[in-house]
Swiss-Prot record:
Function: Catalyzes the synthesis of GMP from XMP.
Enzyme Commission number: 6.3.5.2
Ranges of residues in domain GMPS ATP-PPase: 121-310
Coiled coil regions, renumbered to chain: none
Keyword Hydrolase included in the entry's annotation: no
Top enzyme category: ligase
InterPro entries in UniProt: Class_I_gatase-like (IPR029062), GATASE (IPR017926), GMP_synth_C (IPR001674), GMPS_ATP_PPase_dom (IPR025777), NAD/GMP_synthase (IPR022310), Rossmann-like_a/b/a_fold (IPR014729)
Protein name: Putative GMP synthase [glutamine-hydrolyzing] 2
GO biological process entries: GMP biosynthetic process
A Pfam family hit: GMP_synt_C
Domain Glutamine amidotransferase type-1 as annotated: residue spans: 1-120
Residues involved in ATP binding: S148, G149, G150, V151, D152, S153, S154
Length: 435
């Protein structure tokens, strides 16, 4: 089903994604394009009902003020100016105002009254459209997907499975740095329930041997990332007839790579680093979706709520939460204490309130008392933060009775631990993760 679209032209505003999300929340599809898109390129886009120019005229590139192609105003498509002073625009929206409701009302009026757009953007339509597109792109060929168990790769797997069934080959690499029960969940959901073609590779010893004695966080990340690519490459070479590589690229990955006007936040990468002789065509069915839409897509596809709303998890896994050189006893302490924290937050209803929460175990011990004797064991540090964009973060003021219950369980149930601390550091100055 072809949905109506509102195009946002980027003139250097930091609010592009906020604007796109606001329009999508109205049930109308929206995408961000560079300011110098041509009329021909705009005409080639499907069902464009309106254009929003977002940003001021004070932005420059190489000393030259930037603006949109003036021919856009003669296309016969309504144009709104958001913080852009053009008399030719149908509607003007102030760039800075405290009246959020007035802005929402103006956007809604432009989308529905001025542009006459139809609210036909929803997950059911998206899933059906993507299934059709995937089948058209892939045909009867096979797709290889690295299935980590995270939200993005899980939703991609479920969507590809709906589209091409047994022609999807998933590879799950258990590097020994997963959260408790995570690999088992992947096998249960995708292999046992959804009957996916799943290759499960347990390389725990291989990874932990490579990481032995490595203290530097960046070096740990490089070892984990590099070894993952090598394992994935080895498994890919064992498989015949693979022409496509599925990836969990989402819309913020594309936007954050930057346009000519917006500063690049980070270079986009996903399952990169494969040798050049493994030439796959990419299948990226989620590249249009924001993170909350990815979760909605997962629910639409029937994935378990717990999998779709899984906590954000760093690529190196628990490897950067077992601080310093990774040892098996401290890694187990991180895994067990993290499981207790997640269970108790779920019981208390905090799992739906707190953006991210986890435990870390540092590479030092403290003196304590256990069974009327001196102990010398590891501390566990709890971290729970709230954020909108992960650029800044505040600390969740967890009630004392909940913290005391979590502490009691960790001290009783986790081996080699005699102390529990709560990290009170906001971002800035501290980052969300410790390493």
């Amino acid at each position: 089903m072809k949905q109506d679209m509102i195009v946002i032209l980027d003139l250097g505003s930091h609010e592009n994604t906020v604007l796109a999300r606001a329009i999508r929340a109205l049930g109308v599809y929206s995408e961000i394009y560079p300011h110098d898109i041509t009329v021909e390129e705009l005409k080639a886009l499907p069902n464009v009902k309106g254009i929003i120019i977002n940003g001021g005229l004070n932005n420059v590139i190489d000393g030259v003020a930037i603006d949109v192609n003036p021919s856009i105003y003669t296309m016969g498509i309504p144009v709104m100016a958001a913080g852009h002073d053009k008399a030719t625009c149908a509607v003007k929206l102030p760039a800075f105002t405290d009246d959020i409701e007035a802005i929402k009302a103006a956007i809604k009026s432009f989308v529905f009254d001025t542009c006459q757009a139809e609210a036909n953007w929803n997950m059911a339509n998206f899933v059906n459209d993507q299934i059709e597109l995937i089948r058209r792109q892939v045909g009867d060929k096979k797709v290889l997907l690295a299935l980590s168990g995270g939200v993005d790769s899980s939703v991609v797997a479920a969507l590809l499975l709906k589209a091409i069934g047994e022609n999807l080959v998933c590879v799950h690499v258990n590097h020994g740095l997963m959260r408790k029960g995570e690999s088992e969940d992947v096998v249960e959901v995708f292999s046992n329930q959804l009957k996916a073609n799943l290759v499960y590779v347990d390389v725990t010893d291989r990874f932990l041997d490579k990481l032995a004695g490595v203290e530097d966080p960046e070096q740990k990340r490089k070892i984990i990332g590099g070894e993952f690519i090598r394992v994935f490459e080895e498994e890919a070479r064992k498989l015949d007839g693979i022409d496509f590589l599925g990836q969990g690229t989402i819309y913020p990955d594309i936007v954050e790579s930057g346009t000519k006007t917006a500063k690049m936040v980070k270079s986009h990468h996903n399952v990169g680093g494969l040798p050049e002789d493994l030439k796959f065509q990419l299948v990226e069915p989620l590249r249009q979706l924001f993170k909350d839409e990815v979760r909605a897509c997962g629910l639409e596809l029937g994935l378990p709520y717990e999998m779709v709303y899984r906590q954000p998890f760093p690529g190196p896994g628990l490897g950067v939460r077992c601080l310093g050189a990774i040892t098996r006893d401290r890694l187990e302490a991180v895994r067990e204490s993290d499981a207790i924290l997640r269970e108790e937050f779920q019981i208390a209803g905090l799992d739906k309130k707190v953006w991210q929460y986890f435990t870390v175990v540092p590479d030092f011990k403290s003196v304590g008392v256990r069974d009327n004797a001196r102990s010398f064991d590891w501390p566990v540090i709890i971290r729970a933060v709230n954020t909108v964009d992960a650029m800044t973060a505040t600390i969740e003021p967890v009630d004392w009775p909940i913290l005391m219950k979590i502490t009691d369980r960790i001290l009783k149930e986790v081996k080699n631990v005699n102390r529990v601390c709560y990290d009170m550091s906001p971002k800035p100055n501290a980052t969300i993760e410790w390493e």
